[in-house]
């Protein structure tokens, strides 16, 4: 199957840090279909060869399992081409059409690695130029809008040109191997699903922590914040994966129907729960890995009096028979004490204790997403001392490291998702109604913050966020995993 993959924003950060390395890995693994072209599109004045040289130079600064040899990159570079184009200029679209006519492809993928403000413009100009066709697919990066209203406007503009089956709204967390293994763990094994219910689970925690700051994205981040950047998409998609009912089959819409039910079952916010169950923070100066780092307001491109949040922690509940009364805790932030992303399922203690164990202790299942990729099951076993007579239990853990088990060059998130787009598989992509429900649920939080004169709570860089985050979960008698 021949394909054209058109990367708009072809000289941008996302393309050289994530997309090109993923495409190279797919090429190295022999997964890219033969007869394909990868066309970078940007406003820079570059030749094909100059673009290839630019990508090669950038490969020295990205994560790859193994550096490409000159011969290996040369073979990959044979697929790379470049087109100078301004998406906002209607006069440039005939040049795009000419580029597509150079290569008759079975599938044409339009990947918009650009600012969301250009999504509507691109679709309108594509339609005006008469260039939309059934073999086209469009990939949209998050954040898809700034609010429920803007999200609907973008989706409306895109659907005027593309059918829903042609639209791939990407959330790279869904491409992570551990997330896919969460589906396999739940729906491919009979062990856990009978316990996956309110009677056996005390709480579920979702953590997406970064130790880096905003790097060079000050202007973008200051207009976005952690709620829009991480919670509305990544965190809520992870919540859906862990809480959804078994789908009737493995087809895309069957999976997305069940995720939609979870989003629609989230308890709506009230003034009281907004005060008690939502914490926003902003990092101040501190120390990360022994090095002093500046506070958020001192970062380049950030308003010195900014109230943009770099940390969010919240408590939510799902109002259905499986999960009623079980608290779900979500937290995400920049400049935290470590880089990690995981889902922790905390089971209830044994109902009748005949052994001595830590007070209130229950089993835990931890699904690690990054940097580790694996599962840990925390159990209790009889202690080593006085084994013949002791009735004291000690914690033990079963550890499955997917990288060690299946090899360190497994398919990464973007590699998997890019191949899915080329092949037309929608299972790991987000449908428009899912996005709208997610925006509908987070919008009251944004509105309450806009009316709050106090702004975010300050936390020192290199810590786990504001103390109010720990106080929030402690009110339920629980604690975050790093302190339990």
Segments the model singles out, each with a brief description of its role:
Residues 1-139, 144-484:
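Secretory/organelle targeting and membrane-embedding segments
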